[in-house]
Amino acid sequence: MKQIGTGSLWTQAFRFVVAIACLASPQFVCAQATTAPSSDSIVQHDVPMKTRDGVTLYADIYRPSAPGKYPVILMRTPYDKSVNWAVSPAHKMVLRGYVVIIQDVRGRYTSEGEWYPFRHEQADGFDAVEWAAALPYSDGKIGMMGASYVGATQMLAAIAQPPHLAAIAPNVTASNYHDGWTYQSGAFEQWFDQNWTSQLAQNTLQRLITQNTNALVGTPTLPLTDYPVFNFGQLPADGKLTAAIAPYYLDWLAHPDYDDYWKQWSIEENFSKIAVPMLQVGGWYDIFNGGTLRNYMGAKAHGATETARTQQHLLIQIGGHAGFGRRIGDVDFGPHATENPYTDVILDWYDFLFKGIHNALATEKPVKVFTMGANEYRTLDDWPPPQAVPTKYFLHSAGKANSLRGNGSLTASAPKVEPPDTYIYDPANPVPTFGGPLCCDEEHMEPGPRDQRSVENRDDVLLYTTSPLGSDLEVTGPVTATLFVKSSAVDTDFTAKLVDVAADGFAQDLTEGILRMRYRVSPEHTTLMNPGQIYEISLDLWATSNVFLRGHSLRLEIASSNFPRFDRNPNTGAETRAARTSVTASNTILHDAQHPSALVLLVMPSK
């Protein structure tokens, strides 16, 4: 890696993080707000709020100019309260009779204190809600909105139970900041976590320089300067990122197990503390969509109040983490994909709850999802849809399911006597990430559905495909791969993708998953494998809603890497954060009468 002298460290690193933060995603737009307030609104900038421990947080407040008391919508953000993507909806909401407060969270932009993700959001969120309720133009009803980490600030505030919090509307956010934000089934979410950390380092680095240039002395190297791939191929993973800029990142790497460090912030551990209605908004190609679905199901099942349990709503759109729209990746999903824009959805939510307006939310079913293939929104009674039928597609082959040239198949018939499929996983030559749920650098790696045939040409990717369908088949619900596996290594990964194969061969990825074998027993501790021993595992591919059209085929991809979305398993049993060497692994999928590996889907009844 290139070495950077301390004299030029801050200038090069700062220019770098500014550039990527501006380019990577609409959530990190660097331009200041350009939308001017109308004569119907009043804007107050940098309004202070003191937290219980004496730290001052600053907010911009947008409110109607007419005297009176109004419901409040609060956003608490680490991404800068003055950027246009936050401000533009505020003006629209003011015109609908809401006060909108956008607050920089602790340690970010104008607010004082130390930035450390998740650590202060319960207490600070509680304090912010109660402060907002006491403002002279507030009617005491406080709602919240926002995406990604701004969704996390809502969830964490909700489990703190501030008395005046009346509802929240999290968009594309996680349910657990260990599994689903930093790790997934034991594998490190490398592309997201290193991109997100580097983007937020823009402001952290600027604050450090402003406060004390000497804070950076002694850190002569920064992997930020080697972007776009953060030296992803170099081990160990945690050896370069400076603790002065992102100490939490090193803490994340130091806690691969699901331990008390993570449990203190886990939403899943605290669904029983959620006492308010929630509207969860997600996207089929969002990196947090599994968490969005779990947030809905968890609060509905375990919420603290009858209101919380009965007023959970779920909207899954077509899109990724950075936004929704008609086209994502290689696929145009048609005109219906642009329906349900987020700001309008949020306004309808709060009009219904806070103002008693009888809009669609008063009569619609609580779940609405965009169904790919049919390319339209559909409403459901619940998630997962109760009428969907669990259906197994069993894996078959003549012992050579490797690549598009192989003989793997999927059928409804259980296997009998069949040879297994084996491939070599080499950490030095991992299967590349191509599309799927990605954030936050579309310039270098585009998210969403991409034609997977370039990946499927590899011999270290197994393919199991149905015959072309004779009629449409709708799959809506969770997706799981139950596999019987063995390996020559003491630890390895298994990955899977559900793919919709069109008649012309276009292979659209729908959803995907991974399992690090050392965490197959529990996320709380590691259990290495015995080489050659057969294990039954379950890969969670989250969920989808897709109509496999007549003439299309279902396909299950299996491999042992998906890099750089996930870090590479070195196969040695060593923690990847400290690994300096790797070995190849011979990995095997069994499918016979004693080992009936299968893809498990929820199939909707024919109309």
Regions of interest found by a model, annotated:
Residues 33-68, 465-471, 484, 525, ...:
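N-terminal cap/lid segment of alpha/beta-hydrolase-fold proteins
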Residues 216-236, 330-607:
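C-terminal, loop-rich substrate-recognition/catalytic regions characterized by aromatic stacking residues
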Residues 95, 159-273:
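Accessory cap/linker subdomain of secreted extracellular hydrolases
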Residues 64-134, 180-184, 188-190, 325-333, ...:
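Cap/lid segment of the alpha/beta-hydrolase catalytic domain
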Residues 274, 280-282:
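Short beta-strand/loop motif that positions the catalytic acidic residue
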